[in-house]
């Protein structure tokens, strides 16, 4: 779980992802002296992407690229590069936990490097079997460089 100082609340009334929530997340990172030249990312679920696409400021060519309306994609906004994922957790299936971070705030570790094998299976009519595995994990390295944004989902 995240420290209270690193969370953006769901709001009152509860809302999905809004520009105000993104501004607050940016402010939290800035107040924690996160280097503004470091790339910043925001992992969102498809519903949060839809929330942003429904906001005129985000899709307006005055504020963002025309790509937002033409292709239904938002690449960057307020300095965050958006990554869409269906694997973000939620609280009681109601509030999605969107994560925003500076590049060096998270660390990826490789426990076991890639193992790949390609064999024939005699018991399956000599069909080709492909086996591929690796062990990886990620964690917050610096709490102040990672922010949780709670977003209501309907």
List each model region and its residues:
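Sequence/fold signature of self-assembling virion shell proteins
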Residues: 55-154
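Extended, solvent-exposed, turn-rich assembly/linker loops in the middle of proteins
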Residues: 2-70
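Short amphipathic alpha-helical segments, especially helix-boundary/capping motifs
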Residues: 1-3, 103-104
């Amino acid at each position: 779980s995240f420290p209270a100082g690193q969370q953006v609340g769901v709001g009152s009334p509860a809302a999905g992802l809004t520009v105000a929530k993104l501004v607050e997340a940016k402010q939290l990172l800035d107040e924690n002296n996160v280097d503004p030249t470091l790339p910043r990312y925001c992992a969102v679920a498809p519903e949060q992407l839809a929330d942003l696409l429904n906001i005129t400021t985000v899709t307006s060519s005055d504020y963002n690229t025309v790509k937002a309306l033409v292709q239904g994609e938002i690449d960057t906004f307020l300095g965050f590069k958006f990554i869409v994922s269906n694997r973000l957790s939620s609280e009681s299936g109601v509030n999605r936990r969107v994560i925003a971070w500076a590049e060096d705030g998270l660390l990826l570790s490789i426990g076991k490097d890639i193992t790949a094998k390609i064999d024939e299976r005699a018991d399956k009519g000599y069909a080709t079997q492909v086996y591929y595995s690796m062990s990886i994990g990620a964690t917050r390295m610096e709490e102040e460089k990672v922010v949780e944004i709670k977003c209501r989902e309907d």
